[in-house]
Every structure is written in structure tokens, then in C-alpha cells.
Amino acid sequence: MNPIFLGLNIDHVATLRQARGTRYPDPVKAALDAEMAGADSITLHLREDRRHIQDADVYRLSELRQTKINLEMAATQEMLEIALKCQPEDVCLVPEKREELTTEGGLDVASQKAWLTDYCAQLAENKTRVSLFIDADDAQIHAAKEVGAPVIEIHTGTYAELTDPAAIKTELERIRKATDLAVSLGLTVNAGHGLHYHNVQAIAAIKEIEELNIGHAIIAQAIFSGLPDAVSEMKRLMVDARQQAYLG
């Protein structure tokens, strides 16, 4: 059975801190607690506008984390220099718009292949694995392969927002086909965005998906049940769904 891994996104711990400009809650402490509760990696998005995660968070987590870091960032020169300094195990390149509340869609890899080819190469030379956050689109998957990224993260936001059962089924099939294509090209497939306790199972049941990156839902649930329980419950749902997929 292919295992399924949980990456906890700690951005919204930092969002709460920045709302009052305090020193608490500490996203790095949240990361360490989540690791103890079963999170397999920690995801954090250092945005250009620094609206939640700050540079100091990235550097502190780099020194203290027990699992691995997945640093989400825009493909800019500034972010490249930071990634080269802190050397996260993984970098996930994402699109950014200053006016958006959260990442609204996948990266357009096909339109910037030359830039991303060089960008991915520099990170690879620094022993950082590169992931590209893209929509479940054949052209973008082929482009990801061409620029040298070994991993893609499929944007599940569209799936997460749907309520009509037929539309959900169609979107799941699109994600499955995209996953199959990526695997056939030798890419590792992760997924994330908008996943929560009531919709994660269908994505976790796609056997070829290796990791799910989830943040908002877990941090929200932590208000009521505590972070360790929120993390362990999400991990349990994911693992159960993966096991059921193999049992048929």
C-alpha cells in the first residue's frame, strides 16, 4: 500500500498572531506540537506581503523542526535567496496576488518555462526538492515535467468548493486522470487547498497521491479540540481512506 502523508500548514496560526501584532500564538510551537501529534511535514507560505508567516518564522522552524519543511513561495528572486539560505527540504512554487485572501488557482508553468527551469535547477543544486502548485491540467503537468520539477501539488480548491454530487464526481475524475498522467511522467503527486474533515477522504483514496497539505481546517478545529487531536483526527481520516481504497 502506498502510504499517505499529512503536511500541516501553519499559516493561520501566524494569521491570528498578526491580527493583533502580538508574539503569540507562535506558529513554530504549533509546528512542533503538530509533529508530535503525527504531522509528517510542516508547510508554511512566506508571502511577498508578509501577511502571516514572517522571515523569522522560516529560519526558526528550519533550526527546530523534527520532520521536514515545505516552504510555499512565489517564484521571485527574493524568495529564491531566502530558500537558498534556509535550505528547506521542499519548496512549493505558487502564484500570488496581493489582493487575494488565499491562493486562488494553480501556477501557470507553461507560460514561464524558461524562468522556472532555471529556478528549479538552482533549488535542486541546493538539495531542495521543488514542487509546483498547479491545476489538474494536462498542459501544466507536461510543463512541470519539462522545467525539471520532480513534484506537483494538485490544486483541490475547485473540488472543495463544489456541492453538487455530479460535479464533485466529475472533478474527482479530473484529479484522478491528472494524477495518473503525472505518475506516468515520473512525477510525485501531492494535493491540497480547501480540504477539510468532510471532503478529504475522496482525495486520500487516490492511491498515487503521496501527501496532502492541509491548514485552515485543522487550525479551525484546534480551537475546539486542541491542535494534537485536530492533527491526529485528520491523519486518521486520511489513512483510513487510503486503506479502504486498497480493500476495495
Curated annotation (Swiss-Prot):
Stored InterPro entries: Aldolase_TIM, PyrdxlP_synth_PdxJ, Pyridoxine-5'_phos_synth
Keywords from the named record: Cytoplasm, Pyridoxine biosynthesis, Transferase
Keyword Phosphoprotein appears in the UniProt entry: no
Binding locations of 1-deoxy-D-xylulose 5-phosphate: D11, H12, R47, H52, T102
Gene3D superfamilies per record: Aldolase class I
Reactions catalysed, as given in the entry: 3-amino-2-oxopropyl phosphate + 1-deoxy-D-xylulose 5-phosphate = pyridoxine 5'-phosphate + phosphate + 2 H2O + H(+)
Active site: H45, E72, H193
Pathway membership, UniProt: Cofactor biosynthesis; pyridoxine 5'-phosphate biosynthesis; pyridoxine 5'-phosphate from D-erythrose 4-phosphate: step 5/5
Domain of life: Bacteria
Subcellular location: Cytoplasm
Subunit annotation: Homooctamer; tetramer of dimers.
Function according to Swiss-Prot or TrEMBL: Catalyzes the complicated ring closure reaction between the two acyclic compounds 1-deoxy-D-xylulose-5-phosphate (DXP) and 3-amino-2-oxopropyl phosphate (1-amino-acetone-3-phosphate or AAP) to form pyridoxine 5'-phosphate (PNP) and inorganic phosphate.
Protein name: Pyridoxine 5'-phosphate synthase
